[in-house]
């Protein structure tokens, strides 16, 4: 799944501002400023993470994502799928410049199969520069540049088809939007 989704991420059309055609329910998810991990946990009994890819990559392998981060010799890349009750809900891709790891600590490289949000939102120095929304093949995504003690990282989240972002509660249970 990781390679297919990684390829899909490169084709996302990004918007600086959410498009006016965005359904309100989906826009609310995409513009979430708190922990997406905590929000997803409200919709399942168990949220799990499968680590798809992790390690250092060169700037050349990032493509246009490198424009969102300061130049560096190498970047830490982490790709995961978050599952809600064993259903794939979210593909996450985190890119961390080496200088961010040097400037804060290397804990970001040791998260393993824990959700990134659990670590990030425990940090008092966490700030968010922006949220860009995007869409590709009917799937919605968001991209945020976050900073830990002023050092940036890029987080891209693609909401997979079974994600609660595409459903809304109704009298008959959850309905597809």
From Swiss-Prot:
Main location: cytoplasm
Catalytic activity field: chorismate = 4-hydroxybenzoate + pyruvate
Entry keyword set: Cytoplasm, Lyase, Pyruvate, Ubiquinone biosynthesis
UniProt cross-references to Pfam families, sorted A to Z: Chor_lyase
This protein's GO CC annotations: cytosol
Broad EC category: lyase
GO biological process entries: pyruvate biosynthetic process; ubiquinone biosynthetic process
Pathway(s) the chain acts in: Cofactor biosynthesis; ubiquinone biosynthesis
Keyword Cytoplasm appears in the UniProt entry: yes
Compartments in which it is found: Cytoplasm
Residues the entry annotates as binding substrate: 36, 78, 116, 157
Domain of life: Bacteria
This enzyme's EC code(s): 4.1.3.40
GO MF, any single term: chorismate lyase activity
Family: Belongs to the UbiC family.
Subunit structure of this chain's protein: Monomer.
Database matches in HAMAP family: UbiC
Function: Removes the pyruvyl group from chorismate, with concomitant aromatization of the ring, to provide 4-hydroxybenzoate (4HB) for the ubiquinone pathway.
NCBIfam families: PRK11655.1
Protein name as annotated: Chorismate pyruvate-lyase
Species the sequence originates in: Pectobacterium carotovorum subsp. carotovorum (strain PC1)
């Amino acid at each position: 799944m990781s390679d297919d989704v990684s390829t899909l991420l490169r084709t996302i059309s990004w918007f600086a501002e959410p498009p006016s055609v965005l359904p309100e329910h989906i826009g609310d998810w995409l513009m979430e400023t708190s922990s997406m991990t905590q929000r997803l946990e409200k919709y399942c009994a168990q949220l799990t993470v499968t680590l798809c890819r992790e390690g250092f990559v060169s700037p050349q392998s990032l493509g246009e994502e490198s424009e969102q981060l300061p130049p560096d010799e190498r970047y830490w890349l982490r790709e995961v799928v978050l599952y809600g009750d064993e259903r794939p809900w979210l593909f996450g891709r985190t890119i961390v410049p080496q200088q961010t790891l040097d400037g804060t600590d290397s804990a970001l490289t040791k998260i393993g199969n824990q959700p990134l949000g659990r670590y990030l939102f425990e940090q008092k120095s966490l700030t968010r520069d922006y949220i860009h929304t995007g869409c590709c093949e009917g799937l919605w995504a968001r991209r945020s540049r976050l900073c830990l003690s002023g050092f940036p990282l890029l987080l891209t989240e693609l909401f997979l088809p079974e994600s609660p972002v595409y459903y809304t509660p109704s009298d008959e249970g959850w309905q597809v939007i």
